[in-house]
């Protein structure tokens, strides 16, 4: 399946607003401002197999994952750019799995910004039969954000990777 289009973000009444990603690591800041509408192309290629979907381009993100609020702020559903990268969705009688890499920025030699990507895993292990009236699950959620790169020349020791996770029953 192929999908294409345009993603638009426009704050009515705002003439200037920061183009900062509020979900990032604290030291990684954007200093630019945007005016008018924020337009991005949208493209998704999806291959569906028996119990696995492979998605490339704009991936299914945001609230589709069911991440807990400390890992994903629901306000980002309205303000964040669409996630782009690669995603694996799998479903079986004993597990639901969503694994992805959201590539926010790549770098070339002598770029003035860092490469940035987020890797995530959201799973739900099912402990009893799907036909059961009572269900017991063990969720596992992991989110890692990386900033830096092999050819990053901005400053020394500027590579950062932060990881957080949640397990429950």
Residue ranges of model-derived segments:
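Beta-barrel outer-membrane channel/assembly domains of diderm bacteria
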Residues: 1-37, 41-47
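Residues on the lipid-exposed face of transmembrane beta-strands in outer-membrane beta-barrel proteins
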Residues: 1-2, 41-47, 86-92, 121-125, ...
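Short loop/turn motifs that connect adjacent beta-strands in outer-membrane beta-barrel proteins
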Residues: 2-4, 48-51, 94, 126-139
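Transmembrane beta-strands of outer-membrane beta-barrel pores
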Residues: 6-12, 49, 58-63, 92, ...
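Outer-membrane beta-barrel translocator/channel fold
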Residues: 39-42, 50-81, 132-169
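Surface-exposed coil loops of outer-membrane beta-barrel proteins
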Residues: 55-124
């Amino acid at each position: 399946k192929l999908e294409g289009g345009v993603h638009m973000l426009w704050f009515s009444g705002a003439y200037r607003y920061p183009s900062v990603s509020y979900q990032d690591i604290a030291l990684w800041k954007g200093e630019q401002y945007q005016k008018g509408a924020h337009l991005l192309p949208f493209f998704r290629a999806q291959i569906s197999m028996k119990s696995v979907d492979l998605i490339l381009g704009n991936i299914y993100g945001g609230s589709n994952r069911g991440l807990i609020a400390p890992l994903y702020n629901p306000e980002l559903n309205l303000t964040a750019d669409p996630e782009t990268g690669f995603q694996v969705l799998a479903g079986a009688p004993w597990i639901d799995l969503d694994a992805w890499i959201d590539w926010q920025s790549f770098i070339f030699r002598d770029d003035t910004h860092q490469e940035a990507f987020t890797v995530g895993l959201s799973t739900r292990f099912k402990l009893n039969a799907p036909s059961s009236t009572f269900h017991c699950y063990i969720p596992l959620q992991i989110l890692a954000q990386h900033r830096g790169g092999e050819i990053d020349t901005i400053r020394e020791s500027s590579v950062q990777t932060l990881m957080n996770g949640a397990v429950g029953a």
